[in-house]
Amino acid sequence: MKTPITEAIATADNQGRFLSNSELHASFGRFQRAASALEAARSLTSNSQKLIDGAAAAVYQKFPYTTQTFGPQYASTAEGKAKCTRDIGYYLRIVTYALVAGGTGPLDEYLVAGLEEMNRAFDLSPSWYVEALKYIKANHGLSGQAATEANGYFDYVINALS
């Protein structure tokens, strides 16, 4: 899994050299931000069900046809609603993995890769998940550096879906 630190190490190793001062400084900066990222991951995890349920409600509010149209990809049944919250939970979980890893590696490997094909295969609208992620970003309750860390990953996924 790629993170800024592992990429710097790989580059230095491929060039047969030690890490430069700027690479060491960047790595140290990452460690300083790690506490905030872990705080964000911990908070998102402990509030996950509330955030997921709120995000699903925001999707149903903005796209009411999702609860009125029948089909496996819609939330017109209890099973459909369970799938919707499961999928939103998956997005949120992968964001917490990225926070812990300190880079977009988990997002790239487990979420972004193949996202377009998956949505097309299951006839899922990316706009549903964009709305869900925007809701979570606006309502996660984080502040300061923890919010900055989390919001960067939410923006990354939202941009990938847009």
Curated annotation (Swiss-Prot):
Report membrane topology: Peripheral membrane protein
Taxonomically, the superkingdom here is Eukaryota
InterPro entries cross-referenced by the UniProt entry: Globin-like_sf, Phycobilisome_asu/bsu, Phycobilisome_asu/bsu_sf, Phycocyanin_a
Keywords, in A-Z order: Antenna complex, Bile pigment, Chromophore, Cyanelle, Electron transport, Membrane, Photosynthesis, Phycobilisome, Plastid, Thylakoid, Transport
Recorded GO cellular component terms are: cyanelle thylakoid membrane; phycobilisome
Q: Which residues bind (2R,3E)-phycocyanobilin?
A: 84
Q: Name one GO biological process term.
A: photosynthesis
Where is this protein localized, as stated in its record?
Plastid, Cyanelle thylakoid membrane
| PTMs per UniProt | Contains one covalently linked phycocyanobilin chromophore.
A Pfam family found in this protein is Phycobilisome
Describe, as the record does, how this protein assembles with itself and its partners.
Heterodimer of an alpha and a beta subunit, which further assembles into trimers and the trimers into hexamers. The basic functional unit of phycobiliproteins is a ring-shaped hexamer formed from two back-to-back trimers contacting via the alpha chain subunits. The trimers are composed of alpha/beta subunit heterodimers arranged around a three-fold axis of symmetry. The phycoerythrins also contain a gamma subunit which is located in the center of the hexamer.
Describe the function of this protein.
Answer: Light-harvesting photosynthetic bile pigment-protein from the phycobiliprotein complex (phycobilisome, PBS). Phycocyanin is the major phycobiliprotein in the PBS rod.
PANTHER family reported for this sequence: C-PHYCOCYANIN ALPHA SUBUNIT, PHYCOBILISOME 32.1 KDA LINKER POLYPEPTIDE, PHYCOCYANIN-ASSOCIATED, ROD 2-RELATED
The family classification in the record reads: Belongs to the phycobiliprotein family.
Protein name, please? C-phycocyanin alpha subunit
Organism taxonomic ancestry: Eukaryota, Glaucocystophyceae, Cyanophoraceae, Cyanophora
- Name the gene that codes for it: cpcA
